[in-house]
UniProtKB/Swiss-Prot annotation:
This is Terpene synthase 10. One of its GO terms (molecular function) is terpene synthase activity. It comes from Dictyostelium purpureum. InterPro entries: Isoprenoid_synthase_dom_sf, Terpene_cyclase-like_2. Terpene synthase that converts its substrate farnesyl diphosphate (FPP) into several unidentified sesquiterpenes. TPS10 also converts geranylgeranyl diphosphate (GGPP) into the diterpene beta-araneosene.
Length: 356
């Protein structure tokens, strides 16, 4: 697969995606990654000497330290399980390609595992890990915080079911491209940021689940989801071109719309402007949301929730730039051509010691 239209020059992602600098936060400790990997080994998902799998999990889970920077170890461990579950199911469904019957069956079984805590296919490690993850969430919440638990399970199920239609909106036909409005509607949920934010209601007990019903907050969260999905598409664009699976990447399929775009630069400008407009919308809506609450303590809780959204936005961007696995063969954007040398994950050398 090749890029359809030629660009004029390398484009800087750090200059193209704009958000307030004060949203950045130093990542928290990443020691939880080893513990998450150990849990997976104990469940038979990975082998202790499987360096390739550890590298993959290490790369995925290192994002947690950036997107949930205020977490202590037990909270970080929960974010690690959350992200690991997300990648496990996403990768498994991708491996099924276009087997509709198998895909639907898998989604139904995982839905049962999330809602009922039961395993339908006794040979499914995915279902086993889903039940393990669900049980850990319930233990963390307890019955006194069942509303937070139900909130997250509900959002996970909704996100789960978007994986199927999302895989159907692309085609390898040369002139086909999906409706961007349709893509954006599904991707708002599919990118998983709404579920990521729902996890905060479990991790941080000061957050009131009633805030989830506030329409202005949900608007902010939806805007954040689209901004993050555009960032992810930009970062993964070259790798997906190389692997010939960029059909659902906006930076790829919008180039096919010759009625709107004649160059790759125009596509980039359009998407960067949309992402930055959504950041401006968030900045505009935040004081309006805070103004809805007269009590000072209530405002502090709302601000805390907004800060968590900030960290999802900034953490995703910074981690994406730093993550070594996303630098390969990227010839379209600068800032992704080489590693900064910063270590963002755990070390393979620590595993043998950890498993003693």
């Amino acid at each position: 697969m090749e890029a359809i239209k030629q660009k004029r020059s390398l484009i800087s992602l750090k200059e193209s995606f704009i958000y307030p600098h004060e949203w950045n936060h130093e990542p928290c400790d990443n020691k939880f990654i080893l513990e998450c990997f150990k849990e997976s080994v104990n469940l038979g998902i990975f082998q202790i000497d499987d360096k390739k799998s550890f590298s993959y999990i290490n790369s995925c889970l290192s994002s947690c330290a950036y997107m949930w920077p205020l977490c202590n170890h037990s909270q970080s461990l929960m974010t690690g399980r959350f992200i690991q579950w997300s990648f496990l199911i996403d990768d498994y469904l991708d491996s099924l390609e276009i087997d509709d019957k198998k895909t639907d069956s898998t989604v139904l079984n995982v839905e049962k595992a999330l809602i009922n805590g039961t395993i339908t296919n006794k040979n499914s490690k995915l279902e086993e890990y889903t039940v393990f993850f669900r049980n850990k969430l319930f233990e963390y919440c307890g019955r006194e915080r069942l509303d937070a638990f139900n909130l997250l399970i509900n959002e996970l199920v909704i996100c789960l079911w978007t994986l199927v239609p999302f895989s159907k909106i692309h085609s390898k036909e040369k002139d086909f491209y999906p409706s961007y409005q349709l893509y954006r509607c599904i991707r708002t949920i599919n990118v998983g940021i709404i579920a990521c934010c729902a996890l905060n209601f479990i991790l941080f007990k000061d957050l009131d689940v009633k805030l989830w019903l506030n329409p202005r907050f949900r608007k902010i969260l939806n805007r954040a989801s689209i901004q993050i999905s555009i960032v992810n598409d930009a970062v993964s664009y070259a790798k997906e071109i190389l692997n010939e699976n960029a059909y659902c990447n906006t930076f790829y399929f919008l180039q096919k719309d010759s009625t709107k775009f004649s160059t790759f630069d125009q596509v980039c400008e359009y998407l960067f402007n949309e992402a930055n407009t959504y950041i401006k919308d968030i900045i505009t809506d935040e004081p309006l949301l805070l103004h809805e609450f007269e009590d000072v303590e209530d405002r502090k809780v709302v601000q805390s929730l907004l800060n968590h959204v900030h960290y999802l936005i900034s953490g995703n961007f910074v981690w994406s730039i730093e993550n070594n696995q996303r630098y390969q063969s990227n010839i379209y954007f600068i800032n992704l051509l080489q590693s900064t040398g910063k270590s963002i994950g755990s070390s393979w050398s620590n595993i043998k010691t950890f498993f003693r």
